[in-house]
């Protein structure tokens, strides 16, 4: 009953005001190519040769790492979010010259497309039109500038973790019958008395962890949880596509202010595995009245297995209630500047409140 009361009292306990927050987000991602095999099937694009595919297979980095730090103000009104970055720092990616030249070849092909022509990527009956090279969704005007939507949508997605709306990530709150709960004691957090409750999965449950729940309000103040041993998340294998969630762990912490609870910090880690074993076609087509004409095509057999690990940390530095008018009056920029570095350094964030860089970074 104590755990069930978290969702019952959610609207009473957690702030849903129009507000401006300053937040710091750290993203760390690693990916490892476990298998990559490309088979040259058919081709009438003279600029792309079998040797190019061999170079892609040989030189594609087997281990990739990315790090980014984002300090930003966000304006929030119900489900709307506006993004006003203060500073964004990303790890500079090493570029393989041979892969870079191949990339230039593909870019040139896209640029040499007439108004009544377009490129399309296709696998089986599924296909998607490739945006033109001047489309904002491709990212940036220069190497140090990116579309704001790339970051805005990511931050909005991360903040969704703290709303408890994802019924799969917060399964133990929505499907309490799948879990065993045990009150192991009590403590105080920010002068508030709380239950300390451990939980573990029954046969169909997924997570194990510890909850800190207010005795007075039944608000979830802190949670630390992860996949229980021998448990996996989503798994999907269909038509040569595979995806499995192999690990998850998360922590979240709220602070009380004026009888409402506000997010202060969370972190979570996802481990996923992807596989692809399909033929993929890259086609150039000419628009016609009834059926578009295929001008060029390359078809490649792809056998790929990729493991990925993602670690996200988010710290709310401060929060200020604002009016709907102030929210509506703020106009976002279309692009943001990014600082690229070879390694992270404390001096990058001098005079700013952040999460300290790790030795690994």
Predicted regions mapped to residue ranges:
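Surface-exposed, low-complexity/disordered segments
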Residues: 1-166, 170-176, 190, 243-361
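Low-complexity, intrinsically disordered segments exposed to solvent
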Residues: 167, 178-185
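A short, polar/proline- and glycine-enriched secondary-structure boundary/capping micro-motif
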Residues: 207, 232-237, 273-278
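Short, charged/polar low-complexity linear motifs in solvent-exposed/disordered segments
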Residues: 213-214, 238-240, 280-283
């Amino acid at each position: 009953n104590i755990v069930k009361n978290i969702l019952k009292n959610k609207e009473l306990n957690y702030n849903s005001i129009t507000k401006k927050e300053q937040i710091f987000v750290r993203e760390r991602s690693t990916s490892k190519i476990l298998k990559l095999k490309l088979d040259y099937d058919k081709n009438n694009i003279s600029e792309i040769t079998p040797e190019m595919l061999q170079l892609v297979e040989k030189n594609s980095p087997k281990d990739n790492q990315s790090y980014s730090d984002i300090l930003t103000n966000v304006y929030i009104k119900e489900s709307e979010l506006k993004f006003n970055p203060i500073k964004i720092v990303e790890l500079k990616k090493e570029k393989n010259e041979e892969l870079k030249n191949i990339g230039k070849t593909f870019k040139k092909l896209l640029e040499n497309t007439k108004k009544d022509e377009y490129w399309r990527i296709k696998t089986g009956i599924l296909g998607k039109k490739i945006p033109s090279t001047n489309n904002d969704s491709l990212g940036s005007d220069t190497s140090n500038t990116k579309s704001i939507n790339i970051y805005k949508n990511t931050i909005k997605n991360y903040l969704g973790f703290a709303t408890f709306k994802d019924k799969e990530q917060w399964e133990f709150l929505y499907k309490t019958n799948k879990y065993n709960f045990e009150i192991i004691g009590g403590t105080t957090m920010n002068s508030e008395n709380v239950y300390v409750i451990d939980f573990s999965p029954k046969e169909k449950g997924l997570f194990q962890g510890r909850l800190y729940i207010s005795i007075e309000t039944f608000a979830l103040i802190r949670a630390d949880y992860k996949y229980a041993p021998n448990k996996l998340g989503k798994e999907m294998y269909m038509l040569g596509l595979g995806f499995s969630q192999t690990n998850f762990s998360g922590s979240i912490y709220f602070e009380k202010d004026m009888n409402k609870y506000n997010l202060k910090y969370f972190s979570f880690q996802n481990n996923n595995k992807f596989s692809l074993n399909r033929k993929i076609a890259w086609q150039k087509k000419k628009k016609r009245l009834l059926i578009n004409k295929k001008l060029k095509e390359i078809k490649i057999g792809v056998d790929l297995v990729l493991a990925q690990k993602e670690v996200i940390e988010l710290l709310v530095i401060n929060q200020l209630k604002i009016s709907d008018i102030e929210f509506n009056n703020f106009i976002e920029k279309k692009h943001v500047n990014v600082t690229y570095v070879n390694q992270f350094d404390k001096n990058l964030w001098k005079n700013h409140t952040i999460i300290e860089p790790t030795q690994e970074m």
